[in-house]
């Protein structure tokens, strides 16, 4: 057995690390693991080429060793499933960021994305914006109401020194850490999701 085949399980175990990486970080998005993804792609291609070479020998009636065809195929499927789970979980979290942060991602989140993920976020944002603009005569902002409102105004506390904030009626409000305010629910919904404000019960 070649050293490459002996190492088959090693890369399969690394592929599982992609899934565990997301499971261990449920509340944050880890940086895209470019190197590990590259190794997984490389190993799938390597195993595929080895199996293809064996199949060619079988078709040509040449001596061959087919004992590793199925193990290699199983390893390829395992690596692929892990990679798909990794990409799908990241995609779901990136979509949730659009609802949490709006169209502008914090630097800490953007820096964790690869170029393709940034492109996906931008395209998802554009699609959502087009959909909202086509609802009703003036469009509807679906990001404003994550739950049915109980009142038009809510009591909120600022969790950081945010600075000046303008409500929809033009009122200027200074949001300083621990300051209390009564604000229109629709105006502060996004800031609540971003962690700038919290509801005071």
Swiss-Prot record:
One Gene Ontology cellular component annotation held by this UniProt entry: GINS complex
Cross-referenced Pfam families: PSF1_C, Sld5
Gene Ontology annotations of biological process type: DNA strand elongation involved in mitotic DNA replication
InterPro entries: GINS_A, GINS_bundle-like_dom_sf, GINS_Psf1, PSF1_C
Residue stretches in coiled coil: none
Gene3D superfamilies: 1.20.58.1030
Record field: transmembrane: none
Location of the protein in the cell: Nucleus
Keyword Nucleus tagged: yes
UniProt entry keywords in alphabetical sequence: DNA replication, Nucleus
Family annotation (PANTHER family): DNA REPLICATION COMPLEX GINS PROTEIN PSF1, PARTNER OF SLD5
Subunit comment: Component of the GINS complex which is a heterotetramer of gins1, gins2, gins3 and gins4.
Function: Required for correct functioning of the GINS complex, a complex that plays an essential role in the initiation of DNA replication, and progression of DNA replication forks. GINS complex is a core component of CDC45-MCM-GINS (CMG) helicase, the molecular machine that unwinds template DNA during replication, and around which the replisome is built.
Similarity field: Belongs to the GINS1/PSF1 family.
Name of this chain's protein: Probable DNA replication complex GINS protein PSF1
Gene name linked to the record: psf-1
């Amino acid at each position: 057995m070649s050293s490459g085949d002996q190492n088959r399980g090693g890369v399969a175990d690394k592929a599982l690390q992609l899934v565990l990486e997301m499971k261990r970080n449920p509340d944050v998005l880890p940086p895209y693991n470019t190197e590990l993804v590259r190794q997984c792609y490389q190993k799938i291609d390597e195993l595929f080429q080895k199996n293809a070479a064996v199949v060619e020998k079988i078709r040509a009636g040449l001596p061959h060793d087919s004992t590793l065809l199925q193990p290699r195929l199983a390893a390829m499927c395992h690596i692929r499933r892990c990679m798909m789970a990794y990409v799908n979980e990241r995609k779901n979290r990136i979509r949730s960021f659009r609802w949490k942060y709006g169209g502008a991602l914090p630097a800490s989140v953007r820096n964790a994305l690869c170029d393709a993920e940034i492109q996906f976020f931008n395209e998802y944002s554009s699609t959502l914006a087009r959909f909202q603009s086509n609802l009703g005569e003036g469009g509807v902002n679906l990001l404003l109401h994550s739950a049915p409102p109980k009142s038009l105004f809510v009591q909120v506390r600022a969790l950081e020194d945010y600075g000046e904030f303008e409500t929809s009626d033009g009122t200027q409000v200074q949001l300083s850490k621990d300051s209390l305010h009564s604000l229109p629910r629709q105006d502060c919904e996004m800031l609540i999701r971003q962690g700038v404000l919290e509801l005071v019960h």
